[in-house]
């Protein structure tokens, strides 16, 4: 029986690369190492490039068996046939998106270090709640810190949910060297950007991150 609404393991988050061919090759390498989900996160790209990369990644992820989400732009996620969308505090209201997009679109939400926010967004239909940054992050150096205990508390709350339950995702400064800490703290999945895509060997980095969750039921 499926136990989670969102796949456990390594959740890759795309870097700010304009070279789409380079990005696709990196995604293939990460998937070969065991990445289970991917989020297109392009904060600096223009609308045309963001859409083009989404259209390129959606069929590739289907081919690779990787769940594909788009950050912020849930209508783009629907347009390209992505599996889901990730929404932050300043993005669309998750309850509104759920009402308009229906149950078929996976919704992930940023909860920072706020368990009460997580409770509210789960009630609004979120499929995973993301907490972070758990470690110092080169992507968001000024971001709020979420201690590992937050993951433990979130996991304890969600274990009472009927299967398939929402997932707990950790984000922020995660690398192959520290990913086991978030898995042991209770995260179902680790969202990784530079620790994956800036690694000298992307496939090896993915394999190391994925392995941390193979022993975390």
UniProtKB/Swiss-Prot annotation:
One of its GO terms (cellular component) is cytoplasm. InterPro entries: Aldolase_TIM, ThiamineP_synth_sf, ThiamineP_synth_TenI, TMP_synthase. Mg(2+) binds at residues 72, 91. It catalyses: 2-[(2R,5Z)-2-carboxy-4-methylthiazol-5(2H)-ylidene]ethyl phosphate + 4-amino-2-methyl-5-(diphosphooxymethyl)pyrimidine + 2 H(+) = thiamine phosphate + CO2 + diphosphate; 2-(2-carboxy-4-methylthiazol-5-yl)ethyl phosphate + 4-amino-2-methyl-5-(diphosphooxymethyl)pyrimidine + 2 H(+) = thiamine phosphate + CO2 + diphosphate; 4-methyl-5-(2-phosphooxyethyl)-thiazole + 4-amino-2-methyl-5-(diphosphooxymethyl)pyrimidine + H(+) = thiamine phosphate + diphosphate. 2-[(2R,5Z)-2-carboxy-4-methylthiazol-5(2H)-ylidene]ethyl phosphate binds at residues 137-139, 173, 193-194. Its EC number is 2.5.1.3. Transmembrane segments: none annotated. Binds 1 Mg(2+) ion per subunit. CDD domains: TMP_TenI (cd00564). GO terms for biological process: thiamine biosynthetic process; thiamine diphosphate biosynthetic process. 4-amino-2-methyl-5-(diphosphooxymethyl)pyrimidine binds at residues 39-43, 71, 110, 140. It holds the Pfam family TMP-TENI. Its cofactor is Mg(2+). Pathway: Cofactor biosynthesis; thiamine diphosphate biosynthesis; thiamine phosphate from 4-amino-2-methyl-5-diphosphomethylpyrimidine and 4-methyl-5-(2-phosphoethyl)-thiazole: step 1/1. Disulfide bonds: none annotated. Signal peptide: none annotated. Keywords: Magnesium, Metal-binding, Thiamine biosynthesis, Transferase. It is an enzyme of class 2 (transferase). GO terms for molecular function: magnesium ion binding; thiamine-phosphate diphosphorylase activity. Condenses 4-methyl-5-(beta-hydroxyethyl)thiazole monophosphate (THZ-P) and 2-methyl-4-amino-5-hydroxymethyl pyrimidine pyrophosphate (HMP-PP) to form thiamine monophosphate (TMP). Belongs to the thiamine-phosphate synthase family. This is Thiamine-phosphate synthase. It comes from Bordetella bronchiseptica (strain ATCC BAA-588 / NCTC 13252 / RB50) (Alcaligenes bronchisepticus).
């Amino acid at each position: 029986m499926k136990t989670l609404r969102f796949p456990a393991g390594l959740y890759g988050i795309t870097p700010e690369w304009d070279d789409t061919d380079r990005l696709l090759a990196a995604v293939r390498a990460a998937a070969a190492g065991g990445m289970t989900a991917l989020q297109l996160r392009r904060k600096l790209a223009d609308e045309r490039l963001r859409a083009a990369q989404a259209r390129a990644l959606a069929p590739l992820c289907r081919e690779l068996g990787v769940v594909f989400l788009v950050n912020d732009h849930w209508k783009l996620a629907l347009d390209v046939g992505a599996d889901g969308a990730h929404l932050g505090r300043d993005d669309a209201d998750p309850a509104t998106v759920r009402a308009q997009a229906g149950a078929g679109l996976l919704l992930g939400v940023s909860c920072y270090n706020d368990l009460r926010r997580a409770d509210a967004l789960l009630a609004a239909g979120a499929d995973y709640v993301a907490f972070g940054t758990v470690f110092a992050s080169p992507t968001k150096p000024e971001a709020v810190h979420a201690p590992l205990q937050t993951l433990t508390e979130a996991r304890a709350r969600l274990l009472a949910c009927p299967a398939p339950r929402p997932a707990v995702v950790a984000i922020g400064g995660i690398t192959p060297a520290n990913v086991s800490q978030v898995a042991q703290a209770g995260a179902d999945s680790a969202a990784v950007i530079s620790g994956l895509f800036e690694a000298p060997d992307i496939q090896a980095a993915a394999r190391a991150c994925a392995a941390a969750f193979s022993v975390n039921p």
